[in-house]
Amino acid sequence: MDPTVRRNTTRRLPTALVLTTALLATGCSGRADDGPEPAATESSATPHGYVEGAREAAEEQSRLLLGDPGTGASRVLDLVTGKVHETAPVTGAAGLSTDGRFGFFHTDRGAHVVDGGAWMVDHGDHVHYYRAAIRDVGDLPAGRDAEIRSDVGVTAVTDRVGRTTLYDRTALEEGEVGPARTLAGVHAGAVVPYGEHLVALSGDDDSAEVTVYDREGSPVASPDATCERPRGDAVTRRGVVLGCADGALLVSAEDGVFTAERIPYGQDVPEKERATAFRHRAGSDTLTAPAGRRAVWVLDVTDRAWTRVRTGPVLAANTAGEGSPLLVLETDGALHGYDIATGRHTARTEPLLTGAGKAATGAGAPVVEVDRSRAYVNDRTGRRVYEIDYNDDLRVARSFGLDIAPGLMAETGR
């Protein structure tokens, strides 16, 4: 059944006006993509952007990967068709990450890989959007604390002690986990594929040096830069952002030459208020991260500037980038909007989280996912996902009822 959309005509949405739809239509893992096709581009014998086994679409094909930490049940919610697809259960899943196409359910036994069947390819001056079958791929041998990062060519899995294993991402696209290669050495934090290379931090957690490898794992000329007590990373159009004790380090490449630029906080920041868990919209150069309990850091990578926005008690935060509000899910269960430049509180929803005061933290905590026009919030206890129009005073655009408790959520199609 298709979800029903009802527009909110007031600044704050009464919950009685949210019309929800039970979306219990399920599929099976590896099934062919179903439902009405989105608008597709014209094709030819070998058209530009052609990908075998996929359909090219004219717009973003967003899907939500969902997991129930209690039962291990997993689902994929297609935000274009409104259908829910059932995927293989993942018992003991304690976390969920994504590279924009694949979801990685983290367990003590390894990381279970699900192909969300939606992704984009950014050529700089234009973008291609694709959709394909949703399917379970297999398991990567990694612990629940493993950091997984990908680009179009390679997936890097770094374990908790800094050992990194490399996988051919094209094998994942073909539905299997291919042979693995081990990257020499031990690294502080995740190894990040970027610019057809691998960006890493070599050394211990107190002070690590930027090291760049080629795809075969051989060191290449690296910028002379260090990062003290590294925690957190993100890939933007401007380069790789690495979280350091004094702010961030931006590692970028031009014509195969890598450079590093420091972006300091500009003030003394206590350890517990550092930016260590970055969130952002794919393709955006504006990052967010909690700044302690009652504030959020916003890093404008383009302007090389940090802004600290005071908020209520933070559960999760994100933003779509320049011109969009800072979105903060607070412990009152409501999503709040803030003007990044002024810090002014601009909007809020009614409480979205069932039993807001008891919302989980850490593994299974709610998140805020953001794409080009909407934000998504998962209500684990209420078995629901909310779609928010952040350009319309945080209007609740849709509400998806589910047959699982979606404590884990990540968006693909980006």
Residue ranges and their predicted role:
Residues S29-A32:
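Bacterial signal peptide processing site
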Residues V80-P89, D122-L140, E173-L183, G217-A225, ...:
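A short beta-strand motif characteristic of beta-propeller blades
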Residues L24-G27:
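C-terminal motif of bacterial Sec signal peptides marking the signal peptidase cleavage site
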Residues E196, S202-S324:
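Acidic, serine/threonine- and glycine-rich low-complexity intrinsically disordered segments
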Residues A45-A57, P89-F102, R131-V152, R181-E196, ...:
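Repeated scaffold domains used in trafficking and secretory/extracellular systems
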Residues E56-P69, G95-V114, D145-L166, G189-D205, ...:
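Short beta-strand elements that form the blades of beta-propeller/WD-repeat-like
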Residues A295-R380:
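Intrinsically disordered, low-complexity segments enriched in Gly and acidic/Ser/Thr residues
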Residues R380-R414:
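Blade-level signature of beta-propeller repeat domains, shared across WD40, Kelch, NHL, RCC1
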